Amino acid sequence: MSSSVEITLRNMQFHVCIGVLPHEGQLPQPLAVDLTVWAAPAVDDRLAVDYRDLYRLAAGVLATPPLLYLETIAQTLLREAMAQPSVIGARVAVRKPHVMLPGPLDCAEIVVQDGVRL
C-alpha cells in the first residue's frame, strides 16, 4: 500500500456573484469552499504541495465569471486541483448559505471527488 499526504483548506470564504436568477448576478453572496488534496509524500521541499498555491487556485476559479452553478465551480476547482504536480486525488465541497428555496436550510452543498479514496 502506498502512502499519501492529505492537505485540507477548510471553510475558505469568498463573496461572489453567483446564480441563475437576475438579481443573483448583481449582488455578491458568500460561498464557503473546502479543498482537500492527496499527494505523494514529498522527499524534499521542492516536491511538496504548497497550500498557498491551493488557495490561489480556489480564489482564481471563484474570480472567473460567469458563476451560475455550484456544481460547475466544484468541478472546475476539482479539475484544476488534479492538474497540480504531485496531486493524486482531490475532494471539493462548495457551500452556498443563502439559497432561495421555500423552506429553511443551512446551505446548499455540492461535493465532488476524484482520485484516491482514503
Across the structure, where does each feature detected by a protein language model lie?
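N-terminal, polar/charged subdomain of small-to-medium soluble alpha/beta proteins
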Residues: 1-118
